[in-house]
């Protein structure tokens, strides 16, 4: 086996926002990260995994106010939930901290002052929407109104989820405060900006570049899909980044600027550093060795694809121009769907981590299933609940655990727990040992699905050996004791090798294997040796099959009480009626029935679907921002929709949109988006009025 140079590796996953417990979407990322970290530690590298709660911002402040507690009380309460959720799924954080910490305050100020000294901070007067009832400036997401481009109602202050347009909140038509429902007014305020536009040359080089690791391997900073997106954004021109917010705000006050606070996206990524600094103080590590400009250590961020902009542009630029090292790699992943659709509270598929554990499901079942779907690319993965049951029961119980259960008992009963001193069927074990480096390469590249496919293929070979040698029959035959011990020793060693290869994914089960074999914690290099002439303990069953009834219990536990929602009083924040119009104004809008001929995802967009719609007299190409509500676009083919047919064509970067598809939505976007149905017999081109 190849002995690798010891590496020093710092790993993070995205900071969960401190407003609620974790759900399976969070766990996908933490599991992906944890598997990689456990693998690196098994290889003998010095590897640390840190995370923290993202605690600052207006939403935290307002949520605490609503409950009558302080923001500090709220974030401390939620942190306890997050720690319990993570530990329940066997996530091995070396430190789980908070962005509301003295270390983060000091580091945020240090970074800001360094950027200011390098003339990367600008002060400008801006106009911003202000809630006259709450006496506060409104963040973009707390302003709603009509899209200035397509007039879709109930859109956020920064982008339209219907047509995909981006804009300033001041451009919204008929805006209202999502906090109080009041009509906001414009007020001026001085804000601080990070001059991101001046960082384009550095970012072009960094995003397309790579770092050389201590073992000599070259690590690209970004995945190919991420690089393509960054090239698009950099090519379109980078805008300076507003890094300040006005009081009242829960966060850190900017040095020398009373009443001004760091925007959450400035101090949140610095929270990675703060969590690690806190760990360094506890373990007596040299923090500067890891974050100095010329650091030879490695730093990796595991994130969701929706926060790429911050981690692949804003964060490395901020680090570089404050005199610190940039990341070695940013690894983005896709979203989690359940049974082919976005997680849904009403369907019971918005699964909370705590609920999964409380229903009695083994966290290693989910760790294995998610790993079996993950690769190094930015692809959404689907948790198919029927497949989840079938795969775990087949792979982990039927193939893997079955090897030990069919052999270990004979070693205990017939040979007093003693393995044979040598084996005659060494070829099968040599084959398993030879797979170690290829499996290691798959784990290193985050190609977990490939690694687990290969491990299960090896398990199939071992189970073939079981069936060919039938230890239960050997046990009945006189004079076959030596052969029985030989065969069972081969099987116990094969089980041990497979357990080594699965340990990053199944750490608790691996502990059970280590106790059964009476060995020290298994490392990757232990695959080089065999366990011979050693006494082992009696085998204890390591994993149960999934009872499908547990899945039914889980779904029921996560179903939202729809009747309670229907009976609940209306929220204080409501969308005011638009300005009264005359019948002549309405007559200007030409609504037509259309029939969907084609519907596809739009590459490069997380929000849009591309429709080809038959309007009777012609076929139109229409982009619609309803992807999150319709995860299976092929199922919309043949459906009738309502189209604003005389809307001016709009050129988008994906093509020209020739109309708008009408949808229904509530004030709260969590209520969903819904296409409108028409009765049978309708024909494309019919006018709606």
From Swiss-Prot:
It holds the Pfam family tRNA_bind. GO terms for cellular component: cytosol. It is an enzyme of class 6 (ligase). ATP binds at residue 345. Residues 585-689 form the tRNA-binding domain. InterPro entries: aa-tRNA-synth_I_CS, Anticodon_Met, M/V/L/I-tRNA-synth_anticd-bd, Met-tRNA-synth_bsu_C, Met-tRNA_ligase_1, Met-tRNA_synth, Methionyl/Leucyl_tRNA_Synth, MetRS_core. A motif ('KMSKS' region) lies at residues 342-346. It catalyses: tRNA(Met) + L-methionine + ATP = L-methionyl-tRNA(Met) + AMP + diphosphate. The keyword Nucleotide-binding applies. GO terms for biological process: methionyl-tRNA aminoacylation. Gene3D superfamilies: HUPs (3.40.50.620), Isoleucyl-tRNA Synthetase, Domain 1 (1.10.730.10), Methionyl-tRNA synthetase, Zn-domain (2.20.28.20), Nucleic acid-binding proteins (2.40.50.140). Keywords: Aminoacyl-tRNA synthetase, ATP-binding, Cytoplasm, Ligase, Metal-binding, Nucleotide-binding, Protein biosynthesis, RNA-binding, tRNA-binding, Zinc. Its cofactor is Zn(2+). Zn(2+) binds at residues 147, 150, 160, 163. Belongs to the class-I aminoacyl-tRNA synthetase family. MetG type 1 subfamily. Homodimer. Is required not only for elongation of protein synthesis but also for the initiation of all mRNA translation through initiator tRNA(fMet) aminoacylation. This is Methionine--tRNA ligase. It comes from Chromobacterium violaceum (strain ATCC 12472 / DSM 30191 / JCM 1249 / CCUG 213 / NBRC 12614 / NCIMB 9131 / NCTC 9757 / MK). The lineage of its organism: Bacteria, Pseudomonadati, Pseudomonadota, Betaproteobacteria, Neisseriales.
């Amino acid at each position: 086996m190849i002995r690798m140079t010891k590496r020093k590796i710092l790993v993070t996953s995205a900071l969960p926002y401190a407003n609620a417990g974790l759900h399976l979407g969070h766990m996908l990322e933490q599991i992906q990260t944890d598997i990689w970290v456990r693998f690196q530690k098994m290889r003998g590298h010095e590897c640390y995994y840190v995370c923290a709660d993202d605690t600052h911002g207006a939403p935290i402040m307002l949520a605490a106010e609503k409950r009558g507690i302080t923001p500090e009380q709220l974030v401390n309460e939620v942190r306890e939930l997050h720690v319990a959720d993570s530990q329940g799924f066997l996530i091995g954080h070396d430190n789980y901290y908070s962005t509301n910490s003295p270390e983060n305050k000091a580091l945020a100020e240090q970074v800001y002052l360094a950027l200011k000294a390098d003339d990367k901070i600008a002060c400008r007067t801006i106009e911003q929407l202000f809630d006259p009832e709450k006496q506060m400036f409104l963040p973009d997401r707390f302003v709603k109104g009509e899209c200035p481009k397509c007039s879709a109602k109930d859109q956020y202050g920064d982008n339209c989820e219907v047509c995909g347009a981006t804009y300033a909140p001041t451009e919204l038509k008929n805006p209202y405060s999502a906090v109080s429902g009041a009509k906001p007014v414009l007020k001026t305020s001085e804000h601080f900006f990070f001059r991101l536009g001046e960082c384009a040359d550095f970012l072009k080089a960094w995003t397309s570049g790579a770092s050389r690791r201590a073992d000599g391997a070259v690590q690209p900073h970004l995945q190919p899909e991420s690089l393509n997106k960054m090239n698009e954004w950099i090519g379109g021109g980078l805008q300076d980044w507003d890094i300040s917010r006005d009081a009242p705000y829960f966060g850190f006050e900017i040095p020398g600027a009373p009443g001004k606070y760091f925007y959450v996206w400035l101090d949140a990524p610095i929270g990675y550093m703060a969590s690690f600094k806190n760990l360094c103080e506890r373990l007596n590590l040299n923090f500067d060795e890891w974050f100095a400009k010329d650091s030879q250590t490695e730093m990796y961020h595991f994130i969701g694809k929706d926060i790429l902009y911050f981690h692949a542009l804003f964060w490395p630029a901020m680090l570089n121009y404050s005199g610190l090292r940039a990341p070695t790699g940013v690894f983005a992943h896709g979203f989690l769907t359940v049974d082919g659709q976005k997680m849904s509270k009403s369907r019971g598929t918005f699964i909370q981590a705590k609920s999964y554990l409380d229903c009695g499901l083994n966290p290693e079942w989910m760790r294995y299933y998610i790993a079996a779907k993950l690769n190094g690319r930015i692809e959404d993965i689907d948790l198919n609940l029927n497949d989840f049951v079938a795969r775990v029961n087949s792979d982990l119980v039927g193939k893997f655990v079955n090897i030990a259960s069919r052999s270990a008992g004979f070693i205990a009963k017939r040979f007093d727990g003693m393995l044979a001193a040598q084996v005659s069927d060494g070829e099968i074990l040599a084959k398993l040992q030879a797979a170690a480096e290829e499996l290691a390469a798959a784990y290193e590249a985050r190609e977990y699905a490939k690694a687990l496919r290969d491990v299960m293929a090896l398990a199939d070979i071992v189970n073939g050996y079981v069936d060919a040698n039938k230890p239960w029959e050997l046990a009945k035959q006189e004079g076959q004791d030596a052969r029985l011990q030989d065969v069972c020793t081969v099987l116990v060693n094969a089980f041990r090798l497979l357990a080594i290869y699965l340990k990053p994914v199944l750490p608790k089960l691996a502990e059970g294997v280590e106790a059964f074999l009476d060995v020290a914690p298994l490392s990757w290099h232990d695959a080089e040796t065999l366990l011979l002439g050693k006494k082992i303990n009696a085998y204890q069953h390591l994993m149960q099959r999934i009872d499908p009834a547990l899945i039914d219990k889980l779904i029921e536990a996560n179903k939202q009480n729809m009747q309670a929602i229907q009976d609940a009083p209306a929220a204080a924040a409501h969308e005011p009626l638009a300005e009264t119009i005359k019948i002549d104004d309405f007559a200007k809008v030409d609504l037509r029935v259309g029939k969907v001929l084609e519907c596809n995802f739009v590459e490069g967009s997380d929000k849009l679907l591309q429709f080809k719609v038959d309007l009777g007299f012609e076929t139109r190409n229409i982009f619609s921002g309803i992807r999150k509500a319709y995860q299976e676009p092929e199922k919309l083919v043949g459906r009738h929709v309502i189209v604003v047919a005389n809307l001016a064509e709009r050129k988008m970067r994906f093509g020209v949109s020739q109309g708008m598809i009408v949808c229904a939505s509530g004030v709260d976007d969590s209520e969903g988006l819904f296409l409108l149905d028409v009765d049978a017999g309708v024909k494309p081109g019919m006018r709606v009025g």
